[in-house]
Amino acid sequence: MRNNLIYTMFLSCLHFETFCQNTTTSNDDCEALSQDLDNKNPVECCTTEAFDFLDKKYPNWRKVNKYVRSPYINELRFMGCCNKTISTSAILTTTPLTTSSTTLEIYTTDSDSTTAETTSVPTTTTSIQCGVLANTSCCNLKVTECLSKQYEDWRNVTLIKGYERELEKCDCVLTSSSTETGTVKFLDREFFRVFSSAEIASTTSLPTTTSPSLNCYWLSEPSNFSEWIDGKQTNLRYNGGCCSETSIQVLNSSDSTRWILTTSDSWNKANALINLLYCTPNACPQQSMLWTNCSNLSTTTSSSTMLSSTTLLTTETETRESSSTGSTQTTTPSTEPSTTITTPMEQSSTVSSVQKTRTSEDKPSSSTTVPTSASTSESSTSSPMAETSSSSTTSQSSPASTSTVPESSTVGSTPTTGLTTLSTNEQSTSTSSGGHSTSTFGTTSETPETSTDFTATSTSSSSDSSTQSSNAQTSTIENGSTTTNFTSAPSTSSTPATPTTTYNWPTGGTTWMLPSGEIVQAHKTFFSSFNYFQVLSESLIAYPNCTTVLMQLIYNPRTKETRTEITSDAEGCKKTSSTPTPSSTSVHSTTATPSTTPGTTTYNWPTGGTTRMLPSGEIILSESLIAYPNCTTVLMQLIYNPSTKETRTETTTDADGCKKTSSTSSSTPSLKHSTTPTPTPGTTTYNWPTGGTTRMLPSGEIILSESLIAYPNCTTVLMQLIYTPSTNKTRTETTTDTEGCKKTSTISSSSSKFSITPTPTPSSGTTTYNWPTGGTTRTLPSGEIILSESLIAFQNCTTVLMQLIYNPSTNKTRTETTTDAEGCKKTSSTSKISTTPTSPTSSKPTPTSTSMTTTYNWPTGGTTRTLPSGEIILSESLIAYKNCTTVLMQLIYNPSTNKTRTETTTDAQGCKATSSTSLKPTSPSSSTASPPTTTYNWPTGGTTRTLPSGEIILSESLIAYKNCTTVLMQLIYNPSTNKTRTETTTDAQGCKATITTPTPITTTYNWPTGGTTRTLPSGEIILSESLIAYKNCTTVLMQLIYNPSTNKTRTETTSDAQGCKATSTTQTPTTFNWPTGGTTRTLPSGEIILSESLIAYKNCTTVLMQLIYNPSKNTTRTETTSDAEGCKATSSGTTSTMSPGTTGGTTVSRTTNSNNPIDSSTLETTTFAWPTGGTTRMLPSGEIIISESLTAFPNCTTVLKQLVYNPTTNTTRTDTISDSEGCKATSTAKPTTVISSTATCSSLNLNLNSTTRPTSSEIKDSYSVGEKIYHICEKDYSFEIALQPLKIYQCLNGGAWSGTPEKCVATGKSEL
């Protein structure tokens, strides 16, 4: 049993990632680890485990530029893969794997003793690799296997703090009160020592200066360090003088430094001392003065106290300096105890500044000369600061002011016992060429005025004089041994030779990815040599050759300065999933934790455009897809969580992403690329979508807009408008996919085309729809509003409905996609109907006749739809006939030809496709002559009705047939299933159910108001129509029809001898009130016609009565206009006998009305009201109908009068259309009103400048009541106030004129 357990534990170890062992290898690859920026010792990390670790985690690490390998070495150190400097008291032992338990030596603290004692704890750490859980109750096979299944890299964690929840999932519970050996409780924080498989630390006696209540870890151990730190070889002798509560607090204050307490890596220890603790007040009690040049993290203080005789640290410094022209190396030999240390350069500003040395006169920009008693050189020369920039500035109050400090100044006379340092050097380089810039900027720390114990490291020079460069500032020590040397910081790796653009920094939403895959929000801080910075923004540019360039805008909160860092990676496109992009600068070479190295993927979030809602309720605010030449795609999504009000970034990497955009059913991708449109049918030029989301290509180019075109042969063409920032030009790219129609449907649905079932949008992002703009919105039963929608039909019968939906309650917008695999069957045609008009006198219309009575108005506003050919359906209407045939009429616009046409599609079994309930349908009889007389459009707007079942009737339409059959069509929404269906109910006796109350015998319907027309299947346009019911039960439908092909207008009349049975059979008197409701019309004078009515008398006289409101006077009056010969001017066609059900002949004539008073004795009744609402209507020819009226006369003649304005010729005419057989059953009655007028109006004083009508010869001395003057401006002129080219003045009762005369002025101008 024991052997089985050991064997099982051994096998489990093979599956886990192990920490590095410290076995030196003779591998020739050691040179690869030495060719980094800092030129680190190649032997330091040359271990077999180090190469195994890198090869496993970063397979391509050897291909990375040799100058940017520092992050890899830093991570190797952190993982314990490099040789360590072990103190003389430390013992390193290795426990054989065959033992089931070992004794682990750890530190524990005895409050009564100043030394640490050893505690032996049985553990299996070395067998099962417990990592940070070593020496805890969770160090067992069950917990480690559970963690390995869920978190592959869990052994890389150095602290348990913050991972309690993850541990609980694997039945591991550790509390702050735990008494587990190995847990150190301090300041309410828990820290756990990390032991590798080959490391067991022994006890070490603490110095007598160490507080007995503190566990200072290695801080209490005197040590010798010899490390390359920040580009310099530094030898350190540390006496253990930084063991204090302050040091512990400083290191524990950040996750970036907390782990250093338990590290065994000498490089991290030395770096923490030099760049953090020595600069922190009270961190090192034995240190007499603070360092002021290692970082800006701590507040500097000044003191004139000499260093104590106890030497905390002595160093031997070797400085390597490189520049673009060559390299120089200066070595200061060790002359113990007088030694120096050079601290790292800090790079953190976009505006260069030079070293500031305070003098007694506090002139920060001056050069200071300090005499000393020691002398090793008579003169020295400061090398100029490498600075080449047209934008860099040097803050300097005087060019070269000098201040001399007296020799009696407090300068250490025995510097051999002091700590000698180099004040931080600074450099700023900026080169600009060809629009591309590479910048590295920095600032320096400040040396306190009284810090006289610090002198500058000497740099040998052959010059006998001391000089100062014009763009550098030098601190010189006369007769001394040292000068300040300004050196260049390591420059960033070069970018590709042909960079494409300079990007605006992304605002908001910027993130960066750590090598662990974690995403860090913008404004997160990171540490470089323990200095703390913020990444304000960053952008990644990917080039076709696989190179990526990371641009970062970095802010230093301490100095309040900003700089730009540029990092390139020749293999960057391959590292978007997990591999980090190392940087050549110390900012990215984070020594604290490798995870602070910025990742390779940071995108500019697209602004504007459509948001999408995830099933979880989260909202995708923005997203971007980047495709790399190696087929990898990276989808970045900015996601907002409404419940937590937080935003996060999701990154999805797909190594085979490019294959998702081509056919999945074929063995080879069918995607073809070309720069010109393919010669497929129905190609056209589209208006590029405006607004919305932009995307960036790997080349750095930007896709400003794109559109997907689907053709009947299943081919899709993706057109992209691409902008190249480097050339500032735009081009069009066309991508063709012969199997494209098969890739847009992700769910095969068999529900009706009205189904509102959302389907996921393909992640490949191959389809972008232009949302229709403008028009009418629609409201769903849930209260949400459909802002826009688009339907795409594919050759394989699939239809995809895309809807842009706004939710008023959440103030959010989402996109719904509904796919119907059988969508084309809902609209497919079984026969094409004729578009040639048939004879208007046909007594038995067929579904192809132009005299159909069931015609739908084209929907106005609202949503357009795009056909696979690229044409746009502006509007459409479905007509249902009694024989079950349905006719779909579509008004289609062709952008390429800029023309509009009407398409008609019939379905012989159309009524069956919409009926889901069998209610004993009765086919309407075909024995009668006319088609159905009444069909209602689906009601628009947001009004709905709720059924007892809870379902909602969104809209409904009733069709009444002449055989008394009615068909009710209802569009019903089911909230529980979130689907919509159509119900059809047929009633063979439906017409009888409506006879309930008597109504007036004479019923006249107003012409449809507004400017909307309706198109017949033949392509002809119904400009207006009216239904009249007579006392003999006959109903007459009159339609004013325009034929675009012949450019003529005619009147169609359809009568139904039994039409009145559905409404009324009781005779009532005829009294016409002013028409109410609807929209008013405004006259050119600015007056408003509230209502109007036209009366026709048997003596042929017509009288127009208008109720007019004057806004300026706030009064209302009645205007009456008569025409004594009105009826005669309209009847000119051939008279024929007409019975109900037949259509009479029509003629069109144009006459000029004569306005004469009438004899009241001749008045008869039959009054048609002018249409209420609307202003003017435009004919297909471009002419404008200013006003019109339909009149029915006792002789059965009907007359349509239209006042038509032609903008092209700037003239007005009257068109009269008559039908001699319009009606012969009209009843008459005596009128109740007599209207007469005998007054006249004097001539108007008109300004005829820039007018075409009237001419001076046309102006009369007087006008009769009702006469009009048409005042028309010349081309490009309009009236000064009315802002239109036409005004009509009419003679009123009492001799006054309607309207105020105005003068014509040039369009767009007005005169005061």
Curated annotation (Swiss-Prot):
S-S bridge residues: C1241-C1291, C1273-C1304
GO terms under cellular component: extracellular region
Domain Sushi: 1239-1306
Region (Disordered): 299-503, 565-609, 645-692, 749-775, 812-864, 899-942, 1048-1079, 1114-1165
Keyword Disulfide bond in record: yes
Ranges annotated as biased composition (Basic and acidic residues): 565-574, 645-659, 813-825
Name this protein carries in UniProt: Uncharacterized protein F26C11.3
Organism per entry: Caenorhabditis elegans
